[in-house]
Amino acid sequence: MPIGVPRVPFRLPGEEEAVWVDVYNRLYRERLLFLGQNVDDEIANQLIGIMIYLNGEDESKDMYMYINSPGGAVLAGISVYDAMQFVVPDVHTICMGLAASMGSFILTGGEITKRIALPHARVMIHQPASSYYDGQAGECMMEAEEVLKLRDCITKVYVQRTGKPAWLISEDMERDVFMSAKEAQEYGIVDLVASDTNSTT
C-alpha cells in the first residue's frame, strides 16, 4: 500500500505551533528542488514556478537542484534550463542516480563551478528524438527540420557549458553516450564529484 508523500513538521516564523507539510514543500523552503522523474510540461512548470518564486523571495540565496531523471520532453527541458539562466541566484545542480538526455542537459545548466555528481551517478547524452513518423510526408519533413534546429540549440549549449568542441559534441550525440561521474567531470558536464568535495573538508 503506498504511503503517499511523507509529511514533516514546519514552523513558520512567529508561529508557536508547527504545521505538518509534505516533505517537498518543506525542502522548497530551504531552496532545495528535485527533478526525480521524466521531464514533462507539468514538472517543468512546477520547477520554473518554484525558481521564480524563490528568486523573488531572496535573490542573494543560491538554489540547489537534485537530479535523478531519465530525460523527457525536449522543449520542457529547455524551458527549465532557460529559467535556471534567468533567475538571479546561482543554481547548483547535483546528479544522483541518473541524469540522461534532458536530465543531463539540465544538469549542465547549473552555475559553472557548482555542478556536482555523486560518486556512483551516471550521465548520458544523445540527440533529441522525434515521435511523429506516421503523419503526412510534409509534416514529417517539417518535424525533421525542427528536430535539427533543436539539436543545433542543444549542441551549442553543451559546447558553451562544457568547453568541448562542437564536432565532438555533435559526434557523441549521434548515439547514447553513458558516463561515470568522473567521466562527466572530465567531459565538463559537472565540475566536481561529491567524493572530491568530501576529501577537501
Curated annotation (Swiss-Prot):
Keyword Hydrolase: yes
EC number: 3.4.21.92
Any one GO BP annotation for this protein: protein quality control for misfolded or incompletely synthesized proteins
GO molecular function, one term: serine-type endopeptidase activity
Reactions mediated catalytically: Hydrolysis of proteins to small peptides in the presence of ATP and magnesium. alpha-casein is the usual test substrate. In the absence of ATP, only oligopeptides shorter than five residues are hydrolyzed (such as succinyl-Leu-Tyr-|-NHMec, and Leu-Tyr-Leu-|-Tyr-Trp, in which cleavage of the -Tyr-|-Leu- and -Tyr-|-Trp bonds also occurs)
InterPro entries associated with the record: ClpP, ClpP/crotonase-like_dom_sf, ClpP/TepA, ClpP_His_AS, ClpP_Ser_AS
Protein name in UniProt: ATP-dependent Clp protease proteolytic subunit
Organism name: Staurastrum punctulatum (Green alga)
